């Protein structure tokens, strides 16, 4: 039997409640389908700070490095607003990304048919929307040096951030995008600002060269990032996979997420490079939503983003494509039946809590897996 190791980091706020619903799915898959998941759990964020004085302990970091995949809930809350900057809850997430070398952030923007009316765009523009934004996560202006504020001595200050990309960073993120496109609609749109940024010129060149060398079967289009943002809200279904840098990816993925009408339901994945010996990638999966401390502990949080993150884990870390597809279909079926948590409640639907929503998805998944 294949052994698949999962390390769960529920975190703070609604993270633990949402993770409980994923545990139900894992337990079912192990008992009914001999999936072979081994599960361990650790602390991250504010809960780790309360227990260990840091946002993630070295011991839990070792467990994360050893796992096949990590499921991450959410971190943060007003309780920890006064902790030292280096120990703030978000530092745990940043350390995970850094130490695991997770350079590729995958942000799907999927519009479930039952929620199309909740989008800020006309339903016909977004119904059936399925975009995947591949964002470079460890380079660019967020990490480039120098990064500082200088006192110019004349009553003025100067803020400096540096956008830096090396060839290998662009090659590897482009390769991820092209490979993912092959399992989708086989189209990639690369976005940068080559008209005003030298890093954009290099980005365009390297993506073009990578495409010509290895991925000629994939359709490639280039678009300036500002034009890309406009096209996302004008005609979003023209896109399949979008690949872009850290800064533009941060912005464009949030724009795309809002097209779905359900920002709090979207998953994400962060991937590292394949291991030279095993071919496996380090990977972490997490919902896009935050810790929502205002509703934590009230059993009203929506667990769908966490469940959908587990579906991404099945697909990308364990190549359990059939199971991932069925789990995603189970979510859609539940929504089609009018079952809703408070955040997505609509007229004519039935409101349920966190556990009941998780149970409804599990029941649909069982029916599809029978």
UniProtKB/Swiss-Prot annotation:
Keywords: Amino-acid biosynthesis, Branched-chain amino acid biosynthesis, Cytoplasm, Leucine biosynthesis, Magnesium, Manganese, Metal-binding, NAD, Oxidoreductase. Its EC number is 1.1.1.85. GO terms for cellular component: cytosol. The keyword Magnesium applies. Substrate binds at residues 97, 107, 135, 226. Mg(2+) binds at residues 226, 250, 254. GO terms for biological process: L-leucine biosynthetic process. SUPFAM superfamilies: Isocitrate/Isopropylmalate dehydrogenase-like. It catalyses: (2R,3S)-3-isopropylmalate + NAD(+) = 4-methyl-2-oxopentanoate + CO2 + NADH. GO terms for molecular function: 3-isopropylmalate dehydrogenase activity; magnesium ion binding; NAD binding. NAD(+) binds at residues 77-90, 290-302. InterPro entries: IsoCit/isopropylmalate_DH_CS, IsoPropMal-DH-like_dom, Isopropylmalate_DH. It comes from the Bacteria. Binds 1 Mg(2+) or Mn(2+) ion per subunit. It is found in: Cytoplasm. Pathway: Amino-acid biosynthesis; L-leucine biosynthesis; L-leucine from 3-methyl-2-oxobutanoate: step 3/4. The record marks 142, 193 as: Important for catalysis. Its cofactor is Mg(2+); Mn(2+). Catalyzes the oxidation of 3-carboxy-2-hydroxy-4-methylpentanoate (3-isopropylmalate) to 3-carboxy-4-methyl-2-oxopentanoate. The product decarboxylates to 4-methyl-2 oxopentanoate. Belongs to the isocitrate and isopropylmalate dehydrogenases family. LeuB type 1 subfamily. HAMAP family: LeuB_type1. PANTHER family: 3-ISOPROPYLMALATE DEHYDROGENASE. Homodimer. This is 3-isopropylmalate dehydrogenase. It comes from Agrobacterium fabrum (strain C58 / ATCC 33970) (Agrobacterium tumefaciens (strain C58)). The gene is leuB.
